[in-house]
Every structure is written in C-alpha cells, then in structure tokens.
Amino acid sequence: MGLFGSFIAKFSKDRASSQDLETFKNLLIEADIGAAFADEVIDLVKKADLSELPELISKAITAKLSTKNRELKISSDRLTTILIVGVNGTGKTTTAAKLAAKLKNEGKKVMLAAADTFRAAAVDQLVTWGNRIDVPVIVGKPNGDPAAVSYEAAQRAIQESCDVLIIDTAGRLHTKSDLMDELTKVRRVVEKLTPIDEVIFVLDGTMGQNGITQAHTFAKATDLTGIVVTKLDGSTKGGIAISVERNLDIPIKFIGTGETISDLREFKSEEFISELLA
C-alpha cells in the first residue's frame, strides 16, 4: 500500500485523533516528503471531509511537482549528448548504462564515454555494462583528463553517426569546488563540437534532504535539465520525489527501481500519485 493509502484506509470512517495525526506526520517526514509539505497534508486532514481526502491530497501533490517537460530532449538531425552527473555511490554509472540500453532498445545508435577517469572501478563497470548491452564505450588513460575523454567521445560519436552520446562524468562531492570546476570544463570542451542537450543529476533516493543539498550545488555549477532518482524499490520512499521537485523545480525524468538493466522507468506524475494514494 502507498504512502498515503494506508492512512486514508484507516481513517476513511473515523476522524483522526491528534496522536494519529502526529504519527502520520512523522511517517511523512521519514519518507523524505519534507516537513513543510507534511504540515500541509496534516492541515488538509484536519479540515477536510475524509471522503474528499484522496482528491485533495492528489491536488496538493500535483501543485508541488514540476510542470517542465519530462521527456528526454532527443535531436532528430544531429548527435544528442547527455551528461550524467552526481556523487559517487548514487548509482550514476549504472544509470548511464541503463539509459543507454533503453535508448538502444528504442532503435537509437548509442555510445558511452567513461569520463570518471580517476576511478578505475567506474571505468571497468561501464565497460562491463557496455559489453553486456552491446554499446561501445570510449575510455581514456587512467587518471587522464575527463574533458579530453569527453571530447574524443564526441568526435567519435559524430564520425560514427551515433544518435546519442552518454557521458558518465566523475563522481564528485558537491563540497569540492575544483571537481565542480572540472565538470564545467567538460561541458565547455564538448560544446566546441556539439551542444549538450541534457545534464541529468543522479539522486540517491535514500539520502533524503542531503541529496537535495547536493542537487542544489550541482545546479549552480551546471544547468541541470533533469533528475534520476535511484534506489526507489517501492512507493514508501516516494516522498523524496515531491521534496526534490518542490525545492528545485527540475523535473524527475526517470526512477531507478532495482539493479537490473531494465530497472529504469520514466517518471509519470499521474502514476506516481496513484501509487502514493493506493
């Protein structure tokens, strides 16, 4: 049962007590929905006829979600370039591979670039994924310049008439200004050859408000066009999606729901709200 559904079912007949409301508020906050929005939901419950509660909560959630386009921007007449950014441990490299597999299955000619040059494990992981899904991976020298790898990949992708280039950038802490500057350099160098169409931030869905702080910092360093929320194995932690979009107004484009290559699904707000209210 979804985050709100269990509450609605329990109190569909009886008015919730103060203790019930406090318990529910704590559950909302633990689910990373954010304290401010939790207060709004509780206020709705206090004032509304419980029979109207599902519709009222649905409207409240919709008002918090971004209205920006959630579809990937894919060019029809030139190379589409996507930067995948985020900190280590969020599932960034796996997300790059999942997205490559998805686009390949849709008939696109895809290339991957391993620009996380300072982590041999990340390069090896992307190469392994590339072999598994039959997508070429451009690899540079160990500890080499990530911008150089990205530039070479863009050259190759153009030469080989690829539809999409996905660049897995170095995982970096949002507190390291030199690494954030490096991300800006990658973008600047690639854009000498081809536009950057998407910059997608990978957010660990279990990190709560700290993940939102990270996203804020990345958004200052480079214009983010979308977010992928990973490690969402069920709707019980789905509150983070509301909190992210409420704070950043950057659309969630995909959700990672597991470890397999197919566990990446498009974020559809109507389905998301239905799951929360189920």
Residues of each region from the PLM?
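Short hydrophobic/aromatic residue motifs in ordered secondary structure
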Residues: A35-F37, R119, D233, I261
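Short, glycine/acidic-enriched loop or turn micro-motifs at the edges of active sites
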Residues: G89, T117-R119, G171, M207, ...
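Ser/Thr-centric signal marking residues that sit
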Residues: T93-T95, T117, T169, T175, ...
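Short low-complexity stretches enriched in small and charged residues
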Residues: T90-T94, A120-D124, D181-V186, Q209-N210
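Amphipathic alpha-helical interaction elements
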Residues: K13, I29-I33, K46, G171, ...
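Primarily NTPase-proximal linker/entry elements flanking Walker-type ATP/GTP-binding cores
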Residues: L3-A115, A122-N143, A147-I158, D163-I167
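Conserved catalytic-core segment of NTP-binding enzymes
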Residues: P146-E160, H174-A278
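Short loop/turn motifs enriched for small/polar and acidic residues
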Residues: V85, A170, D204
